[in-house]
Amino acid sequence: MNQDKIVIKGAREHNLKNISLQIPKNKLVVITGVSGSGKSTLAFDTIYSEGQRKYVESLSAYARQFLQMMNKPDVDAIEGLSPAISIEQKTTQKNPRSTVGTVTEIYDYLRVLFARVGIPYSPTTGLPINSQSVSEISDNIINKNKDNKAYILSPIVRDRKGEYRKEIEELKLKGYQRLKVDGKIYEIDEVPILKKNFKHNIDVLIDRLVIKENIQQRLAESIEVGLTLSDGLIYLENLETNKITTYSSKFACPVSGFSIEEIEPRLFSFNAPMGACEECDGIGIEKYFDDKKIIPDDSRSVLKGAIKPWETKVFGYQKKFFVETISKILKEYKVNVKTPWYKIPQDVQNIILYGDQDNEKKFISSFEGKINFIDRKYSETERWWVQYELEKYLSERDCEVCKGFRLNTKALAVKIAGKHIGEITKKSIDDCFSWFNKLKDNLSNNENKIAEGVIKEIKDRLEFLNRVGLDYLSLARASKSLSGGESQRIRLASQIGSGLTGVLYVLDEPSIGLHQKDNQQLINTLFKLRDLGNTVIVVEHDEDAIKQSDHIIDIGVKAGIHGGEVIAEGNLKKILKSTKSLTAQYLNKKKQIAIPQKRRKFNKNKIFTLQKIKTNNLNNLEVTFPLSNFICVTGVSGSGKSSLIIDTLYKRLDEYFNKSLNREENYFNFKGIKNIDKVIDIDQSPIGRSPRSNPATYTGCFTPIRDWYAGLNESAARGYKPGRFSFNVKGGRCESCEGDGVKKIEMHFLADVYVECDICKGKRYNRETLEVKYNSKSIADILDMTVEEGFDFFSKIPSIKQKLKTLMEVGLDYIKIGQSATTLSGGEAQRIKLSKELSKRSTGKTLYILDEPTTGLHFDDVNKLLKILHTLVDEGNTVIVIEHNLDVIKTADYIVDLGPLGGIKGGKIIGKGTPEDIANIKKSFTGNFLKQILKIKE
């Protein structure tokens, strides 16, 4: 066996055509090729799958039950495999407790650091609080009170209301004779009856003594008794100076009594009861019924359905009563019931939503308010569909108790250099790194010795995150809010931090979402992973990554059935010599994406302006977009691109078109809406969550296919309607598997196994339905065809052919018509959505928004995509793309460049104009790279 190479023999998984190849170990290997050529099939479904399967197989049966079993890929043999780790874009953590800090393990080190050198502070006084042993307390008392008469007191009640008869009786039974009550000493039998509704202080008099050196044993015993009685707290009252000093065996504030039992790493864990905020259980957020969701269109009146929940089936039957009640309130405050909601005075709105708390109006004294009513209904109902319906009106905000820090008061009371752990995690990675660089100066010599190793581990990991362009993120950022590219690079950084060697890493386009400025640092990070003694296989389209890799494997020539072959492999020189390789043709510039000879002009009469933009890190911007243009929004990661386009532009336009009846455009802080009639966000979210969702159902292509089959003579003779050919309803589907085509078998010591349905053989339909055929093909055969095959098959049926044509135009000719939505990548899902829009009739006034549409695309695919997007613009529409790909940016008519950096260091407009304009802006990172591509001289 060759120990220096991974040897693959006869790989036939999916569209791979019995390929055999050798991949060098301990190298950076890039697998490239057009979309659908078989890159991911080779990297993930063959190499990684077999590596993982062999590793899991080596474990005991008991251990295997907790791990996902991988199916054996269709390959004759793979030799020389190492344990494999996959870092995909799809692995974004959905757990709300997962953060950047926990994923990278930085938070674990932070917890240790705060437990070892953190100092607790009193929330009341802001002063540090300390713990002392009995010996330390005794020595302190003797040193500071020598020859003075004093009381040793144990506080039992501190500023609390009550009579405390039972407590005093228990103290009497224990043998205590004197108490100090509200500042006065009493014999225990002579304590006056305490007023129940007044706050009291009760201390047990433990000892009366003159402080001298020779009373150490007696003093220590009294201290120990007092500490035990009051759970770690005693007072020393000097009778000559009348000064009272508080001593604590725990971390306790002498003023407020605030105490911390022990400072251990688990105190700082928001996943442990000891550290988590009691209110939000460590999530950091609370859900509340949002008046903006309950009243989405405030231009409506109460009569016209302003309060949306009353229009639903949950409360619809009570609507008449609700309207009558609110009408009485409005009448009392002299407001017409037909008045739009936004014109109703704020105090009256508050009464309608939250009730009349002060009972100002007797006739509505029992009115609890609509939001309070909905909240109560949500809490009390046991009907899942009612809860589901009401959850639509919930929003999230920071927990009011912990302020979003996730931890309880005790954990947040511990500080290092004036900062608690929550404040550290809220800093950007970059600021956090700077803070730790300066921390040494704020610690004592002893603290530095204790913290040295932990700080090094934290700084190393922060530096890795900086290197891969994630300096703008914070450690507190929830993992579920990260993009696929961000999630992948975070996991990449944590793998480097782990220091593993001899591992096979398989990565899926780690450059996604990364600006060219940070690209080289990412490549250097991959080299570092390789230099640790690992094999790094990367599915990638980035030109720099391909050129700098040790070994390149080009799969092609095209996609689907026309792909699955190794077109070229070897180092860069070898690849460039290949005449068959599309990748080589783009790398040596024989083929390239052309720079437009003429750009569309900025028409001052056809513009759209967004004003007062303060979303996330945007600094009160005003941005003008020229319509009927191809516009690119650029900038480094975290600069505010998505905040501007997705969270502001799309959100405001969507609200205007879909929720408002008669609002003026000034209300939404924009101008020029007359030139836009709809906005469409073509994002990368799945086209469906169920395996039954597929390209045919999403694009509407399946409807004419079912109609066609229902119209065949055989169907007419049998009385079959279009519903007969649906696998979602009873009738034509296989009832054994309910139209899924597979059955789930539960295994006791193995992962669940999905096996082909033995009745329909994976066809989804029953035998009678499958007997209806068109040109010898059943409905199941159609779903199993690729888009390209389907296009040829239905070439004479325009209603079907046209929808399949648009899928081919966006480069998806290789996917199957009935391919499960769960197996599609984000880029494929986005292009399916784009094809659906292309199949609609263009109005010429549509605004299309796309976020990184080149994700997962080869140079040749990008070329095809650009032609489609520019065609949309030629029809009068406007296309705005958020993009890092310079081949796309250079073809733009207009660019809005944000920066200069990410997070709080971003959010500003660095430049706007044509690519040539941006290239001449020295402080623009995007401009610096454009200058090289456009060949603009200084």
Question: PLM ranges: what are they?
Answer:
Residues M1-E938:
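Conserved phosphate-binding elements of NTP-dependent enzyme cores
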